[in-house]
Amino acid sequence: MDIQTLEIVRKANRLTNELGTNDPHKIARELGIEVIPLSFKKQRGAYKVLMRNRFIFIKDDLHPVMERIVMLHEIGHDALHREEAVKAGGFKEFNIFDMRQSRMEYEANIFASQISLPDDEILEYIENGLKVIDV
């Protein structure tokens, strides 16, 4: 694991440890990020800072599992890229599953995946004899 990825993992772990949860809606609420459901056509979510207020806009008809992933991804942008979001202005659409497209998307995905399934939880699964297919 490279230094940059390790720092993202540490930041995700610190956040969940400080807040005592990995629930994205609770995390957003604790961080003061307003979550607004929208009827996006294609885009699943977006993170935006407007006049120092932080927002996550989320597609209103996502499956709960996908909503969780997208929410954690957007929280990753808040934790890692808030300054870039302030400078960027409008919405920018990226495919969150194509990490080759953007460094920021890659980093937000690492952040989201660490909160979704932290290393210690993976180790617990392995120690209990579970396989990837079981998880």
Per-range role (PLM):
Residues M1-V135:
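Active-site hotspot residues in diverse enzymes, especially metal/ion-binding acidic/histidine motifs
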